[in-house]
């Protein structure tokens, strides 16, 4: 395979080297707003010379406490040291629980293991294959950020792409590498950090990432890195969790909050098991966390973390179409689409919904926000690139952390 330039391939968690895209001076004091959900809240406004952006809601009586919760546009951790701490937590979680590995009981690293994972993945996510377009990647230099157990990796390789994987965890790198060994496929596998990709500028024709970049503290920085490693004219295909989704706005904000009260009793755990069909072990872990600190569990950021990828997941974020597009301001031909509907979001009736209606619901209020974008063929000075007007919508859901 081609020797793609690699820089600091072993620096899994490097220190911050670049200023944050959205750092501003002249922040204003928090201002009060009314709450949709009853509790007194403050909306925090940031003002620059040309625009203002409301970025957070803080449930607190103290302006000082509100100020401490300001988290800008997907850069969800305010200090470099805290950012590194959170990233280590993320790394540890996914090292112990590689993406999708919990959906099979087959021995890890066996052909049956990979086969069962793929059957489940593409049954649950039928739109994924068309969103990526593997058949169009022959001969392209493809980078996947966050390879998981290698389902898409294998499809890229079999389509003739010159495939490279980078993942924060050694577990995912090893599992995907083993898959390639079993299939006689060629690829490159590197443990590295999406916020500081270990590749030279312009190394790839396509950068793909499915459900990964919303788990890193500084998502805007990862998008800048995607832009950097793409060759002129190269494409990015990225999936992030969708803020304006039924899952976030209804399931997490309302249904899961009500379920938390149900999980406080033994009978409630049994009832929840019948309604949501989740593993009892997972429900009991939720119950333990609720018992330890009910208020902390019901904090919206914690609700998002613990009810997306497992009760011990340390970090998830959600993005609107607008906030996602703003992160891709350096690109052209930016297009978004929404996919994925889970029948379990409507307990009791979800599985009765016809597939045609389910597909429509997914296209409107689905959980997966896909962003398709292309790097400009010619470098343009930053002040000549049209940036979208600043949104007054909170950007990532660390930007809407509710502090009890």
Where is each model-derived feature located?
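Class I SAM-dependent methyltransferase SAM/SAH-binding core
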Residues: 140-196
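N-terminal, positively charged/glycine-rich alpha-helical extensions of SAM-dependent methyltransferases
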Residues: 63-118, 404
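Short alpha-helix
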Residues: 314-332
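A short glycine-rich, Lys/Arg-flanked "PGG" loop and its adjoining helix->strand segment in the class I
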Residues: 220-232
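Core SAM-dependent methyltransferase catalytic element
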Residues: 332, 354-396, 402
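Conserved class I S-adenosyl-L-methionine
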Residues: 235-293
